[in-house]
Regions:
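Short amphipathic alpha-helix that is part of the acyltransferase structural core
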Residues: 14-54, 61-77, 170-190
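Short hydrophobic/aromatic beta-strand or adjacent loop that forms the aromatic wall/cage
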Residues: 65, 161-164
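Conserved beta-strand in the GNAT
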Residues: 67-69, 75-85, 92-100
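Conserved active-site alpha-helix within GNAT-family acetyltransferase domains
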Residues: 124-128, 133-159
Length: 190
């Protein structure tokens, strides 16, 4: 599936500086020829290799529920990965992350478009909820709230306001509580 949306972008124009223009952003599933671009994207966005190593390990171990990329003029400018996450009673849900957007393309809504597209695909697939460890001032824009309010704790020692959950199916969510455990790839790579 391809989702095409329009986004504002600052485009350099010789002699005029940067102009705000509407450009088509394509959101699609990752393809094998995107792997190198995604690795470079992670390195540039995070300033290190750890997140790229996690993405590579998840992909290599078949632990990806959904992997979307955002492209601008056929160039990968963002990506989002969802992987399985288990809750105490053998319940599997989706963990969002890593997600990255090229530094020069940030603050243009690309990350938001990736989150919205990915969350909708998971909702359509019947996923009860999505967990994220992320910025407390960013993810609530998309409906994420502290997971502790639903009786779910993170296996890692992280502040309550950065361990968040987005409910996709309230009926399936009612009986769920416990300790959320990420896949081993998140703690076994550096």
């Amino acid at each position: 599936m391809i989702l095409l949306s329009w986004s504002h972008a600052r485009v350099p124009v010789y002699g005029l500086g940067c102009l705000e223009v509407h450009v088509p952003i394509e959101i699609r599933e990752e393809r094998p020829d995107d792997v190198a671009a995604v690795r470079d994207l992670n390195r540039r966005a995070f300033g290190q290799d750890q997140e790229g190593n996690i993405v590579d390990a998840l992909r290599a171990n078949g632990a990806v529920l959904l992997f979307l990329v955002a492209t601008l003029n056929d160039r990968v400018v963002g990506h989002i990965v969802y992987s399985p996450l288990s809750i105490s009673r053998n319940i599997t849900v989706a963990a969002l992350g890593p997600m990255a957007v090229l530094p020069e393309c940030q603050r243009q809504g690309i990350g938001g478009k990736l989150i919205e597209a990915g969350n909708q695909k998971l909702k359509d697939a019947g996923c009860p909820f999505i967990i994220v460890v992320g910025h407390a001032d960013y993810y609530p824009r998309f409906g994420f709230k502290p997971a502790s309010g639903h009786g779910i704790k993170c296996e890692w020692d992280v502040p309550d306001d950065v361990f968040m959950l987005l409910v996709l199916d309230r009926a399936k969510m009612k009986a769920v509580s416990g300790l959320a455990r990420y896949r081993h790839e998140f703690s076994s790579v550096s």
